[in-house]
């Protein structure tokens, strides 16, 4: 049974049991800032399990794309060298949110494994938590698993409830026992059952984990039964495929074999058991899907992990003798294997290929540069008879140039040199400590809230007359009242205030009644459906239970809406002008502007910017209505709605049709495109490799910008005594005149310098047969100084000359030495002798050198010392 069929049968089986098939979420978690990557099926349901989010179903099943590389869950170094470690894997799962519990979960698992997949019952073993009699009895008395194949696992990790068979989301919160299902490969494979001394062998392989969220654990370790008991299960597709395809390594399944063959083809290696081919096959999956989900190779966070995986794959190709780009060509092979299951991969194929190709080219330049540094260091080491490469140098190669330690070690090994890995590790530890202190991925600081949700009315209304205060916070702590002058967060049962989300800033405004006035400076989400109004109480005392009138700043909201709607039109226009590879990578929409980051590999041309402006303003002039519909996510995407990579969407989504644009969006927008008024791009630039940024303005801001620009053009035209329409022509004429005058001035300076040069020749002093001259040439530029030095060298025959000029508080110096004298007197040393005394430095050839300085007051003394310096050289 092929992997694709196994995946499909799993999802269809649970669909037949009343489960909703939920698409895989992004590898970039949308609801958990503590995670680098989605690493299990339950991540997208975390808020559901915590009660902070509701879904329209109580049963779900998924095939979740997952990555474990970087952070707490990091399998990277084991990948390719063990049978079951991967950076990327698919987790098949079924979930119950307060619906069924242990009995159904266990029966479903058994039915799928033995009925649908037809695994022999006598090959299956199970484990349960040692206190979970309920699960034990279901397995033994209802399913019929012999008790000798049901193993109770106790607290085997050194503390109460610290067990392989007891799951907990965190130190506090939902937790519960779990039951794992193992497959027995038979006595021909070494290993013992779980819980035995030989459990690390390969005979008994865990294939499925059933987690029963049964309790809530408090800070003191007390367990309280959850009001809604939940189920979270996970079965690795690669592991179950290995079992069903009768192989002992995940790399032998059909999906991996196709990719390993592709790696062999690209590297010219015929031995398909080579571990480096396994590494490459694994890494093409992780890299491609991370790029699909919007991650770009970079130097920090997720981008750094992606870059590390890409470079590890390239390095293994390099070890196999592949000295040029190859990795990006495997994207097509991956699409052939997984494109049907994940259409987003197929759609992004060209973009993924381009990103990987660019990263490869960049890294091969790194390898060449790193090899040059390493070869030089090894040559020095060999000359000294050393046999150990400095670990600090190895770390510098790794940290500064991206040169992997194992590649450094491989090169050294060929020279019978070892790397001081202890020093390398010490340097690495210092860097990790610095990174840890920087805390790139810290737990989001939130407010503890367990009350009612906030009903949002802001799409239709800007005022809500009877909003009830249901919670108050001061300095992060819940309070019953807030007094005049205090900053606080107010939670209402109803609000027209939009909470910051999707790049759009939160509303500002006022909460008030007859005795209270609270100025709202920002609006943020406390939870998915709970809105916090942040601000200052300007009058009265505000209490929980008070009723207030909630009114937003309507002018600010209207300006923000114009900018947000313009962003949608601009996104569509950018895709038309630059190509369908353009994907949003970030945005900020406020009352002043829209800032939009997108994937594109080159600066936009003036013509492309102009074309985008034309397209957007044509949509504005069309004055098309904005139409909002709520529908299932899959229906929206099938209907052409653009979903943004990395955004978290529910199963019901809000679709905005605005002119020629159709996007999923929960923000606030104009009623018609004409409300935008005018659209103008004011900035375009790069923010990272492969990421461009555009800033644009709309409405009255755009009108003021154009008026200001018009005023500046008129002022410039007046200065040049031209009509605004003739400004370009007039500027060209002025530039031509300036060039002509500069040419005349240069000729005059040269002529003047030549005449001064004739006079200066008579000032030369002969020292040891060499004419020495050090003088200032008034009004001369560097070019004139150089020409004069050349003429003086011809005239004086054997000479050492320094000429200087001063302009704008800066010193220019030229030194010239004739060929016969340059064996002893070097022009570079001569010019530096003078430059150091006038606050500068310089250099050049033995016969001609240039320098500058910033201390002209010291110039006379410096020139006076030239004769003695030259005399010392002779």
UniProtKB/Swiss-Prot annotation:
Reactions listed under catalytic activity: tRNA(Ala) + L-alanine + ATP = L-alanyl-tRNA(Ala) + AMP + diphosphate
UniProt source species: Paraburkholderia phytofirmans (strain DSM 17436 / LMG 22146 / PsJN)
Compartments where found: Cytoplasm
Bound cofactor: record note: Binds 1 zinc ion per subunit.
Main location, first listed in the record: cytoplasm
The protein, known as: Alanine--tRNA ligase
Cofactor section: Zn(2+)
PANTHER family reported for this sequence: ALANINE--TRNA LIGASE, CYTOPLASMIC (PTHR11777:SF9), ALANYL-TRNA SYNTHETASE (PTHR11777)
Record has Mitochondrion as a keyword: no
Pfam families: DHHA1, tRNA-synt_2c, tRNA_SAD
GO molecular function terms noted in the UniProt entry: alanine-tRNA ligase activity; aminoacyl-tRNA deacylase activity; ATP binding; tRNA binding; zinc ion binding
